[in-house]
Amino acid sequence: MSEFRSGFVCFVGRPNTGKSTLTNALVGTKVAITSNRPQTTRHTIRGIVHRDEFQIILVDTPGLHRPRTLLGQRLNDLVKTTYSEVDVIGLCIPADEAIGPGDRWIHEQIRAVAPRTTLVVIVTKIDKVPRDRVAAQLMAVSELVGPDAEIVPVSATTGEQLDVLTDVLAGKLPPGPAFYPDGELTDEPEETLMAELIREAALEGVRDELPHSLAVVIDEVSPREDRDDLIDVHAILYVERDSQKGIVIGKGGARLREVGTAARLQIEKLLGTKVYLDLRVKIAKNWQRDPKQLGRLGF
């Protein structure tokens, strides 16, 4: 690769196939929310991979799925728009699950929406299964996508094959100048990242009905008047029902305090300063199905 290359790559796949973890591993810092709950990525976050010979801008999309709510439909539209605007699509299929109808549907969607975009298939989570299972999955993936797509097995957790994947992706980008200055790792505003970190902490270890019903809005960020080493962050967690409010707050407010502590530590890392984090929980009835409320909450 003699001339500098730069371009956009998006990872797609069923929910929970390791797309956000992969983004964070390639960038080398946390820019995408990771959670073992499916469908937790809501915005297309661009993580940026800098090397001397190339720059890869990673667009992290929500998992593509058959939508059940207006929010689900908007997330799917966002994914499809992204498909047609990038240089390379990385289809993520985990090594530890058999290929199913969801994977086939997504492959069909990619070929229908972006037939000319370069496709690389990434077999994720290879650390979770023995070598023979990885080999069998590579064969199955090859049957699914045919001879045109390159297939790369990786583990974002252990780092195995990440350098190979980076080189494969970079090799498929067009020649061109860097889009972002060296050292910049994401173009997401800090407030969006803070909201995502709070959302991630709130989703940790809760029941299945909550992820889709939880939205976080940063209400105010301001330096503390009498202290230049402290920033006050006020955030509101919106849920759809009273019962969900109870889940988020927990007995005597214990769960909300845990969420606050976990999120505050991550936000302090992000901002590089001490943070006072104030969290409130409010109900926005059925916000996922209401266009006005979706707009107000940033979708």
From Swiss-Prot:
GO molecular function: GTP binding; GTPase activity; ribosomal small subunit binding; rRNA binding
Location of the Era-type G domain: 5-175
Region of interest (G1), ranges: 13-20
Subcellular location: Cell envelope; Secreted, Cell wall
Domain KH type-2 intervals: 206-285
Stored Pfam families: KH_2, MMR_HSR1
InterPro entries linked: G_ERA_dom (IPR030388), GTP-bd (IPR006073), GTPase_Era-like (IPR005662), KH_dom-like_a/b (IPR015946), KH_dom_type_2 (IPR004044), KH_sf_prok-type (IPR009019), P-loop_NTPase (IPR027417), Small_GTP-bd (IPR005225)
Biological processes, Gene Ontology terms: ribosomal small subunit assembly
Main location: other
Presence of keyword Secreted: yes
Segments for region (G3): 60-63
GO cellular component: cell envelope; cytosol; extracellular region
Top-level taxon: Bacteria
Keywords annotated in UniProt: Cell wall, GTP-binding, Nucleotide-binding, RNA-binding, Secreted
Signal peptide: none
Chain residues that bind GTP: 13-20, 60-64, 124-127
Entry similarity comment: Belongs to the TRAFAC class TrmE-Era-EngA-EngB-Septin-like GTPase superfamily. Era GTPase family.
Protein name: GTPase Era
Species for this entry: Mycobacterium sp. (strain KMS)
